[in-house]
């Protein structure tokens, strides 16, 4: 498994409870596809440097996780289905050991 980091930007229209539910569902997707979340860093609501989908604010969450490389396309497909997830970026932190 490889070590990845995902940074998620979520809609500012979400309530605190909806925001928590959304990032927990991403956490569950990682686990259901054979991954292991190592760290979750909730940044909360922040002002954006430039508008994203006409929003000037958004909720940020950063997760570090171990994940099988062959499951990455399915994980990204699931992320794209979430309407309140404005943007995400997955970064490879370490090669397979």
UniProtKB/Swiss-Prot annotation:
Keywords: Ribonucleoprotein, Ribosomal protein, RNA-binding, rRNA-binding. It holds the Pfam family Ribosomal_S6. It comes from the Bacteria. GO terms for molecular function: small ribosomal subunit rRNA binding; structural constituent of ribosome. Disulfide bonds: none annotated. The keyword rRNA-binding applies. InterPro entries: Ribosomal_bS6, Ribosomal_bS6_sf, Ribosomal_S6_plastid/chlpt, Transl_elong_EF1B/ribsomal_bS6. One of its GO terms (biological process) is translation. Binds together with bS18 to 16S ribosomal RNA. NCBIfam families: S6. Belongs to the bacterial ribosomal protein bS6 family. This is Small ribosomal subunit protein bS6. It comes from Dictyoglomus thermophilum (strain ATCC 35947 / DSM 3960 / H-6-12).
């Amino acid at each position: 498994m490889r070590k990845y980091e995902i940074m998620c930007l979520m809609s500012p229209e979400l309530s605190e409870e909806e925001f928590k539910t959304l990032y927990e569902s991403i956490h569950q997707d990682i686990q259901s596809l054979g991954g292991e979340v190592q760290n979750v860093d909730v940044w909360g609501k922040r002002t954006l440097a430039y508008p994203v989908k006409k929003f000037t604010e958004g909720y940020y969450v950063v997760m570090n996780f171990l994940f099988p490389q062959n499951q990455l396309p399915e994980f990204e497909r699931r992320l794209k289905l979430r309407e309140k997830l404005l943007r995400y970026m997955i970064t490879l932190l370490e090669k397979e050991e």
